[in-house]
């Protein structure tokens, strides 16, 4: 699949490094009833909004990225023989919030085919004001928002929320977006948009769900900026996420995956 032109996306969100420490784990510690992991190797990849960025860029989208500069890391310790995650250790520093001047500069010199907010609620976007500011200023640009916040602006028709079932259930009852402005992902059951369910028809072996929501979001925007038909974009994103969960760690989509999805 060839892009008809060069598409540009503004991505704003929390960034981290995903890390996997692999090793052999076949005995308990004599000091405490916990497993001993003999380290064999380490893999790292961009996580959270960084994962969205990597997927978009891999598919040929130009991305302007506004994120925290402080290094956040999620380290998972994995038994190589079973691929069982033993424990996850998070390093989460205090994050300086997005400064209005950063956003102003990014919006001043470029026009974007879409804007993405990937908000893991780690402090870079301390409230929902950024959503309102962007959506109100650019009413003709779709703003895709993946957020863990429970109080959301609902008055903007150009905002598309992408949240999972748990996040949907946690929403403030007085701040639930209209059905056409909200996609709720359901894991291996697919997604719901505008009261319509989009099942994931691919029967796949789930190897690792890390970053699957980021893959869904990136694939959704990748498709939508080229062909703004939400039903088709969701179906495409479902298949992209199904590919991601079959791979260990955070998987980066490739154009070969796009061709495979479109040829199914």
Regions found by a protein language model. Give the residues of each.
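Short glycine/threonine-rich catalytic loop with a Thr-x-Gly-x-Asp
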Residues: 202-220
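Ribokinase/PfkB-type carbohydrate-kinase core domain
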Residues: 1-32, 40-207, 224-239, 247-264
């Amino acid at each position: 699949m060839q892009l008809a032109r060069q598409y540009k996306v503004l991505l704003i969100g929390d960034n981290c490094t995903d890390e996997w420490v692999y090793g052999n784990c076949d005995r308990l510690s004599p000091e405490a009833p916990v497993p001993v992991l003999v380290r064999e190797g380490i893999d790292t990849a961009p996580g959270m909004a960084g994962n969205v960025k990597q997927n978009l860029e891999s598919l040929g989208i130009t991305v302007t990225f506004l994120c925290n500069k402080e290094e956040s890391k999620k380290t998972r310790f994995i038994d190589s023989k079973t691929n069982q995650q033993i424990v996850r250790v998070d390093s989460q520093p205090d994050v300086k919030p997005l400064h209005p001047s950063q956003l102003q500069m990014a919006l001043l010199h470029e026009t974007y085919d879409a804007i993405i907010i990937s908000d893991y609620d780690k402090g870079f976007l301390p409230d929902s004001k950024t959503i309102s500011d962007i959506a109100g200023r650019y009413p003709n640009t779709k703003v895709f928002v993946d957020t863990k916040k429970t109080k959301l602006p609902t008055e903007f028709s150009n905002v598309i929320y992408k949240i999972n079932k748990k996040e949907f259930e946690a929403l403030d009852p007085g701040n639930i977006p209209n059905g056409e402005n909200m996609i709720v992902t359901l894991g291996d059951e697919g997604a719901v948009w505008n009261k319509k369910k989009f099942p994931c028809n691919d029967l796949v072996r789930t190897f690792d769900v890390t970053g699957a929501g980021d893959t869904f979001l990136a694939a959704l925007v990748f498709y939508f900026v080229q062909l703004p038909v939400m039903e088709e974009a969701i179906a495409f994103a479902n298949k992209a996420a199904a590919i991601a969960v079959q791979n260990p760690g955070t998987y980066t989509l490739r154009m070969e995956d796009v061709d495979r999805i479109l040829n199914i």
